[in-house]
Amino acid sequence: MRNPNSAAANAAGVVSRPRRALSASGVAGLAGLGLAHVAVAAEADAAAPVATAPATAETNEVAGVSINAKRVADPSSSKFTAPLVDTPKSVTVIPSKIIEQTAATSLTDILRTSPGITFGAGEGGQPLADRPFIRGSSSGNNIFVDGVRDSGGQTREIFNLEQVEVVKGPDSAYSGRGSGGGSINLSSKTPKAESFARGSVGVGTDEYIRATADLNHAFNDNVAVRVNVLGTQGNTPGRKAVDFSRWGVAPSLAVGLNGDTQLTLSYYHLDTDQTPDYGIPLTTKTTQPRTASGILAVDRRSFYGIESRDYQKTKSDIATFAIDHAISDDLNVRQVVRYSKSLNDYIVTNPGDGGAAQFVQGQWWMKRGTKTRWNPTKTIAAVSDIHGKKTFLGLENSFDVGIELSREENLNATYSTFTTSGSACPTGFTIAAATLTSLGAGDCTLVYAPNDKDAWTGVINRSPAARNVAKTAAIYGFDTIKFSDKLLLNLGLRHDSYDSAGVDVATTQANGVFTSVTYTPRKGSWEFTNYQAGLVYKPTESSSLYVSYGTSSTPPGISGGDQNSNTSTGTGNLATSQLIPEDSESFEAGAKANVFNNTLALSGAVFKTTRQNAQILVGPGANDYAQVGEVEVKGFELGFSGNLTPKWQVFGGYTYMDSELVRGAITISNGTVVANVNQGDPLANTPKHSFSSFSTYRVTRAISLGGGAYYVSKSFGGNQGGAGGGANKIYAPSYWRYDAFASWTISPKVDLQLNVQNLTDERYIARTNGVHHADPAPGRQAILTFNVKY
């Protein structure tokens, strides 16, 4: 895997440079550090007298209802002014226990347990990063860490997560600007007023190794420090030459844990180095008979990249200062200040972007194309709020009022990748003149037997970077008004002042050298106000019925689904006009309940979401653009979480989504206006049916068995606003996936866990952009994890 360093990024000439792999000894070293600490502490713990107190049961809030558990899983945000069972909105909290038992390591793994969420493919102007779709809308720009927006396209890790919280439906009252589908909050681990240590070492097939340590030391009742450490590496199961290496550290300090004022300092660092993978080609790139899905029937392991050139390196650093002060028993103030930076840097082979495949000398050949990005971001954010409970006009009010200020800066550049010497194209293979100028000759590979070991020498230069600075100033308020024990009113309001300014860059290049650069300054300012309102009726103390309404605003650029774009103007006659934000609104009605003596949480909701004001072509002229595009998603979802019996745990749900491109851009054929070929089709990355269930059963005091079952129906390829798989009707076929789980508690401090992911080695497509490529999901993998704790 090659990686040009920053000093040489603008210098011509390439030398193959292997990536920095985190060696097995390095991972083992991290494991040894963590486990040695655990072992020493456990020995000291056994030798020293310890004061103990009876364990107390706490209440989990999962999918909006309470279940008995050892760890609280309430959303961490004070914007939730009522328990989730009394919150009139679809909210799912995925607790640490589910994260651990499923052996999740990424955001994709975690969100698999929550039906109705899919992931979009890179390309089409989108970064190679986490791109979750919630209820038909790209929500990559709506990912938060501890309530503060986590800007930039990234691939996230879970080693420092306590839980993941998913809000579904338009929620700009909660989160500000967004795509209308919902938001995801990653809740970090924080210091506790008790000392403990946990260490894990996992080994598995496909050269998988992972070591983590979670060390918490309480100096006294008020001061504690916690450190989480990660080292991992391996290969992607079922994919040739796709490997990864990651390491991270997350220290935090808390002062005043049991006092009226608590101060928390935390830092998070993650470093990744991996082979990027754009999957397999589509049949549209050949004249072969089309498969039903439009995805070429090649071996699942087929990898079209070049091991010596392709790379992806990401970095993430987050420093946070937070202070909470209890003015009284019913009133608290909070201040959070965050500085973060990230980098997403890659060169990836796109198997369908170098031109159509050609049948030459009795075999199918293709010329490789590339997608590249160099995208550093910096964010400074501050959030202040006051929350509590007061009686006004004889009614109990639980409220949260706050302000939010942020400045987000990102640079976005690309690399030239001009081949001077590479795998030869066969005699008779034709290359377009423009492709010869931009990519060079050679760099061909067989469609049905690609060779990732092909040599490559060429010119890599980084282009001048586009720059954007987005500033947000917002004020918000939430209130839950208690009219009686049976009737509650939940209200939310947020007003945003959002400014975006920057410079766009257009370049031309020949033979890998950028020959001209055009800079175009732009800026835009928007004011938008969003609301939410919900009425809750409680038949019993542990159940609720509700109806709710919510809105969302999506500024231009973000409406395209790109985490890093803030375009302000449009196309054609809208090129000199500031576009208005797209607006989303949602109606929802649902029910939540605790059953079986509050050990099982059940929830259900019906919803309808509409997004309007997308820019589309409406007439035959070049200036016939208008913001009248519209999409709609309606459906229902069911959720369950908790215990069917004291030994049987379940977590999962089912989502049905009936999505539609209500009005899309017209097309022009021989001067005649033709309706959008996909109008009326289902939206991209929005399967009609999705189901997930993860369940474990304690067979004996020491042995637990279980597993997961996941179903996703046919899902069309494309990006935000796309539908029906585009003109080529490309889709990812439906699939069932099964996982297996087993654990053995050797002692109260030691256990073994076995996970077999994709148990039947199901060959399925995780996502497709509908234009160039489709991404196969990982194949079967077995992981054995050794856990120690005290």
Question: How would you name each of these model-derived features?
Answer:
Residues 324-338, 342-348, 545-546, 578-665, ...:
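Membrane-embedded beta-barrel scaffold of Gram-negative outer-membrane proteins
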Residues 232-237, 249-256, 260-326, 342-377, ...:
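Acidic/polar loop-and-plug regions of large Gram-negative outer-membrane beta-barrel proteins
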